[in-house]
Amino acid sequence: MKELKDVIAALSVKDQKAKINSIKANAMGGSLGLSGTFDTQDTLKPVVDFDIDVKDMIIAKVFTDITTANKLVPLLADANGNFSMNMDFHSDMDGELNPILNSINASGNFISKEVGLDSVAALEKIAELVKYPALKNPSLKDINIKFLIKDGRVTADPFETFI
């Protein structure tokens, strides 16, 4: 995250483990809430375990600026709209303190009133094949997706949306 504003934090550090009681900040057009632990007892393999709460962030900004988010769901880097999300997130960290992709385990909900998807090659091809032009640049409405990340692989429960 490149810029956090109006940060309020309560944390403690003991035995190479930061316990984050609460961090609240404004970022990427919305707000972020975070609590959990950052454990560096094994200095070669730090571990994070966070509860993350996102409200009304700009989708494209998050999925462009946060490398891990982009690697997990690259499709959303070109999406339009805002989203909210709650997520339990666990990961090992590398030497630069970035999550190690294949160690990420998480679950949560992705919620948005509307997500616009522009210039997605797969959707454009499907739109041509089924002769349904609305699929070329769809705008998905009233999204509530329950997702799971297991060892860095994202899956989602079936969900309904309107185009």
Across the structure, where does each feature detected by a protein language model lie?
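Small-residue helix/turn framework positions
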Residues: 1-163
